[in-house]
Regions:
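Low-complexity, serine/threonine/proline-enriched polar segments
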Residues: 26-89
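A generic structural signal for short, non-catalytic loop/turn and secondary-structure boundary residues
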Residues: 5, 70, 113-115
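Short, extreme N-terminal segment that most often corresponds to the first beta-strand
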Residues: 1-29, 119-127
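Alpha-helix boundary/N-cap detector
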Residues: 18, 22, 32-36, 49, ...
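Amphipathic alpha-helical binding modules
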Residues: 97-127
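Short, flexible/disordered intra-domain loops and linkers
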Residues: 90-95
Length: 127
């Protein structure tokens, strides 16, 4: 549950200790997202933060900025299972294929050539 200035999340993913721009470049080089999201990418080409939305369908990126539960030296990368904003008073119904989630996260992790464990992260981020 969140208050008026925060959003709660549940994400299946892993910790990444690298630069978000570097991660974004790896995603565009290794996954077929550029064509699908090119219009969105072009729209936000000068706004680095907004351009992340172009590939959020593939993965979610959570940085320290505004998230108390994330240390300064890490980024969480994975798939969001729940993302509640201040207008939500309950957790929305959803169903997830665990095998598919884990495989997607493994694919992303493999492209980054890192071996950090896949975990479930929960927390609250500022809106």
């Amino acid at each position: 549950m969140s208050n008026s200035s925060s959003s709660s999340f549940v994400i299946v993913g892993f910790e990444y200790k690298g630069d978000v721009k570097q991660f974004r470049d790896i995603v565009f080089e290794n996954f077929d997202v550029s064509e699908k999201y090119q219009k969105e990418i072009d729209k936000y080409v000068n706004d680095e933060y907004e351009s992340y939305s172009a590939y959020y369908e593939l993965c979610s990126i959570l940085e320290k900025n505004g998230i108390d539960s994330i240390r300064d030296d890490k980024i969480l990368i994975g798939k969001k299972l729940v993302d509640m904003d201040s207008d939500d008073s309950y957790v929305p119904d959803s169903e997830h294929d665990i095998d598919q989630l884990v495989q997607t996260v493994r694919d992303i992790r493999s492209k980054l050539n890192i071996e950090t464990p896949i975990k479930i992260y929960t927390g609250t981020e500022q809106c």
